[in-house]
UniProtKB/Swiss-Prot annotation:
Role noted for this protein: The VirB system could be required for the establishment of the replication niche in the host.
GO cellular component, one term: cytoplasm
Classification of source organism: Bacteria, Pseudomonadati, Pseudomonadota, Alphaproteobacteria, Hyphomicrobiales
Source organism per UniProt: Brucella suis biovar 1 (strain 1330)
Keyword Protein biosynthesis listed: no
Localization annotation: Cytoplasm
UniProt-recorded name of the protein: Type IV secretion system protein VirB11
Molecular function terms, GO-annotated: ATP binding; ATP hydrolysis activity
GO biological process: secretion by the type IV secretion system
Gene that encodes it: virB11
Keywords on record: ATP-binding, Cytoplasm, Nucleotide-binding, Virulence
InterPro entries attached to this UniProt entry: P-loop_NTPase (IPR027417), Sigma_54_int_dom_ATP-bd_1 (IPR025662), T2SS/T4SS_dom (IPR001482), T4SS_GSP_E_ATPase (IPR050921), VirB11 (IPR014155)
Superkingdom of this protein's organism: Bacteria
Amino acid sequence: MMSNRSDFIVPDEAAVKRAASVNFHLEPLRPWLDDPQITEVCVNRPGEVFCERASAWEYYAVPNLDYEHLISLGTATARFVDQDISDSRPVLSAILPMGERIQIVRPPACEHGTISVTIRKPSFTRRTLEDYAQQGFFKHVRPMSKSLTPFEQELLALKEAGDYMSFLRRAVQLERVIVVAGETGSGKTTLMKALMQEIPFDQRLITIEDVPELFLPDHPNHVHLFYPSEAKEEENAPVTAATLLRSCLRMKPTRILLAELRGGEAYDFINVAASGHGGSITSCHAGSCELTFERLALMVLQNRQGRQLPYEIIRRLLYLVVDVVVHVHNGVHDGTGRHISEVWYDPNTKRALSLQHSEKT
């Protein structure tokens, strides 16, 4: 008697063809997709590929990987997963036929004439706890302590000594989360660009802005993402600062550089920064360092999910996530010109808040 194999599904011919189309368009990337030592394959613009091997990025020129081919890859992938990618829906998240995760961003959400493709290869590595022990995996666990780390002590000493240039340089190098605050015309964006120059050139950077200002001529592994300035998450706009922040989580950034926080995307910024993406730099309008936290909390409340949180919880999260606030001012009336008026850095408060929560739980 023949058994009824109801769990065996034969893919239909159309699905097979769609998968074959995706695999055909992936052929220029096949050498790296098939390399077991490579974990991430990224295309920032036509003709070039960046691959991550052993936590380091490698660059490869691929002349035949042109714009039209990348557009076709996006279309084939969208059809495979029964989704859409177009000028009006320029961001696509999908799983490829062989199980890789892919994130595609096309114009107008990225630079004209470029397409961002990020492919995360699934890991088939298996380790036992004994394997981890032999590799020294458990040797660097830090106990929860009220004392500051050596890096925190170093930054605090620089700030207390008034050596603000060295303080900011080290804060960037140590991947602190930095918010530049000030009024309109105070020089926030210009200072942000100066801080970005202190980022190591081998890191992968993603910028998010509505107007192209954050140029990265010295960082080859970068992607510029754009959203319409009038786009609002509350109105279900397809591309907003918030949707691009969430997209970044699938694009393997070392750092995310958001030109300005204006509204509900502050909630997503907190999530991104709290998820381990250190070194993010952004700006906002605020009259002082302390008011920066109030302004950011009010922005979080503009988010559907953010407004479900009590105000004090939001403020606590901000103090835990934001490491440095730099307030800039344009002294047009007293002749002092553009300058830094305040710097907030308080690791002791951050540590106390963290320990307070741990003791309660």
